[in-house]
Amino acid sequence: MMLGAFQSCQLRLEVNASRLAIRESLTHPSQIQDWIFPQQLEPGLPPVLTTGLSYKSQFSGLVITHEVITVNDDCLKLLLSGSVEGFHYWYWGAGWVQSHLEGVSLLPLQLVHSYALFQLRSFLGQMDS
């Protein structure tokens, strides 16, 4: 049984980063953990996300399961379950990143989504420094 409201949010940001730097920040768990705070990824993840991988993240006692549906040079698609029932799609290129999040949740997804993207932009900016 899904609790919460259906929510949908999309953001596209300009970032001062190469396509490769963006890809690595979205597909390497060690880098994801550096910018996704206060959300915590489960320990023991492989160095790079791969299609079919399922992992959990936690935020204030709420657990989200992420299943990697697709990962390639410019796209990451995740199926979400648990505290968010839906999907999260990422697309990127040189100098930009776009995220589309849809799901049913009690969490304020638009706020969480915006905060995460601005953290990512800040992280990528620090990498360039």
Model-derived features: positions:
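Beta-strand/loop substructures that line and gate deep hydrophobic ligand-binding cavities in soluble
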Residues: 75-129
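Hydrophobic/aromatic beta-strand elements that line small-molecule binding cavities or substrate pockets
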Residues: 13, 64-70, 86-94
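General beta-strand recognition
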Residues: 21, 56, 65, 77, ...
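A structural detector for beta-sheet-dominated domains
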Residues: 16, 58, 69, 79-81, ...
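Short, hydrophobic/aromatic-rich segments at coil-to-beta transitions
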Residues: 48-56, 70-79
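Short glycine/proline-enriched coil/turn segments at helix->beta-strand junctions
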Residues: 18, 60-61, 73-74, 93-96
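Glycine-centered tight beta-turn/hairpin loop motif at sheet-sheet or coil-to-beta transitions
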Residues: 6, 59-61, 83-85
